[in-house]
């Protein structure tokens, strides 16, 4: 720094001044120098104080200059950094800064990946919903078909029962009408005075005979009952129906305390059974509910159906354990 160079020059100058009288002095001049040494020492002390003061002032000036330069540099650096930050902010706002573009590119890439994944997931969800809808439609159709078959069997059995009763009533009406006509004819003959039967002599019966003490209506009722029994069991023309009905009722099925007894075996809720119907393939199902006159079960496809105990008794359906 300039201060140190000046100090070096002044120190060298003082050394030269101190060494100069030693080089030029002689033995004869030593006495004169001793006499003048006192005055020179006073002058040198005054010069040292002035130099120190002058140097101190120079140092203070130099320090103030350095502080001023440092402050200027600091302000300049602050302004430069502020301008750089403003420029970077403008680049970010304009979308041109690399610090902004690189994370933005990563975000856009992640957005594209997530959008693609969301699209695939949406397609899978739509396909799943469609399959579930088709499955429910199929189950509803199968349930409807099973209910239609059960309804058809029920109506058919009821109609067959009604036909049987009508046949019995028809036979009984025929018998009753015949007997009633006979009774009317006999009464007319009794009232007719010119009837040839009255001229006949009473028939003499030999041996044991039966005397009927009943009224004609009582005899007619008894005869009707006998003819009904003969129509249901005796005559040859009724035998095919009887054999068919015997075949239909050859199975034993009843419901007791929430369980089903069928052909000597017990069935309960939650058991898996095999349902067999004529002219159809057997299917497996799980019993869900057992009522007094019907049994509900669930098929493998989720559809629910019911069997009437009367259908099991008639042999239209048969079940067994799996």
Curated annotation (Swiss-Prot):
Residues 1-16 have a biased composition (Basic and acidic residues). The keyword Nucleus applies. Transmembrane segments: none annotated. Residues 17-51 have a biased composition (Acidic residues). One of its GO terms (cellular component) is nucleoplasm. Residues 50-82, 147-178 form a coiled coil. It is found in: Nucleus. Keywords: Coiled coil, Nucleus, Repressor, Transcription, Transcription regulation. The keyword Repressor applies. Residues 1-56 are annotated as: Disordered. Involved in the histone deacetylase (HDAC1)-dependent transcriptional repression activity. Belongs to the BRMS1 family. PANTHER family: BREAST CANCER METASTASIS-SUPPRESSOR 1 (PTHR21964). This is Breast cancer metastasis-suppressor 1-like protein. The lineage of its organism: Eukaryota, Metazoa, Chordata, Craniata, Vertebrata. The gene is brms1l.
